[in-house]
Amino acid sequence: LGKIEAVCHKVAEFIGTRARQRIGSDRIEDGKVVMSRMAGALVRAILVAMMVAMPSVLLVDVTTDTQQMVALVAIFAAALTFVEYNAVYPGLVEFRDAKPFNRVRFLMLLTTVIFLSLIERGRMAPTTLTELTEAVGTLIGASMDFPYSPVRLARLMVTDGANEVQAHAVRTAAGMAYLISLLSMALFIILLRAGAWPRQGTPFNVWVNLPTFEPSAGGDVVDRLNRDARINIALGFLLPFLIPAVVSLSSSGFAPLQLTSPQTLIWTMTAWAFLPASLFMRGIAMGRVASMIRDKRRESAVPAGPFLPA
């Protein structure tokens, strides 16, 4: 009996040790996940702050008040990004786990801001790089400036009293921004077709990636996703044409004095090209999610046969 009790004690000690080791390893893994998420959120916040401050860094003759305002906006954007990506549960950012979606959008936004900032810098402190960028932008703007094109309609935001230099600056910035948005959408579609997202065999959480979408609001989820996808794609296609028309009808357009501000021109043309492309990509992503759910339902459906189970 003594030997049996000794063996039982050893088994109990072994099981307890394994349980404690398992709990310790789980805590270590949880700590690694938290640190990894925090590091990723910090890197994203720094990149967003750099993107917001990029025009003020590249441009010359920026006033102190403008620098302070831009720094405040950059800090706010960085804090919002850090809080959003460091949180366990989603808040406002959609497709948080869809790497191509947000990365392509950020790359599009950053590239547009950099190229437009280089073009505007070349008007004050020309260099070889700025002259090359402006020449490419001028060529793109001229090639896209045909009747009823988005670039032609973007010039409606300029008042009739604006001189030729201001109209040329708007056309160059609009052409460059619109081309970058088209290339970004093409890159996003290529990544989807190549299978980079969503990957086969990986779980997809609709709530994490679509926090503002309510699956239990009523109706079939697939039909609602397809409907929202069509609406986003339609808005993404129409907004480059509607925004200049709305601005032209609601007011007399931007005053020529405001067009002399490089940062106003940079952020206006960036938003004009980024918002439609972002809606277009959102519609494509939602359509892809709807097709995923439809395929999962088809795979989990019981195949019809001549006999029914008892």
Predicted regions and their residues:
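Loop-to-transmembrane boundary segments
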Residues: 33-42, 217-240
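Long, highly hydrophobic alpha-helical transmembrane signal-anchor segments
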Residues: 90, 99, 104, 122-185, ...
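Transmembrane alpha-helical insertion/packing segments
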Residues: 29-94, 100-129
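Alpha-helical transmembrane segments and their immediate juxtamembrane interface regions
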Residues: 251-298
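Juxtamembrane inter-helical linkers in multi-pass membrane proteins
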Residues: 197-221, 295-307
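Alpha-helical transmembrane segments and their membrane-interface junctions
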Residues: 119-135, 234-252
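Juxtamembrane "helix exit" motif at the C-terminal ends of alpha-helical transmembrane segments
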Residues: 56-60, 239-262
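Alpha-helical transmembrane segments
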Residues: 67-73, 173-192, 270-274
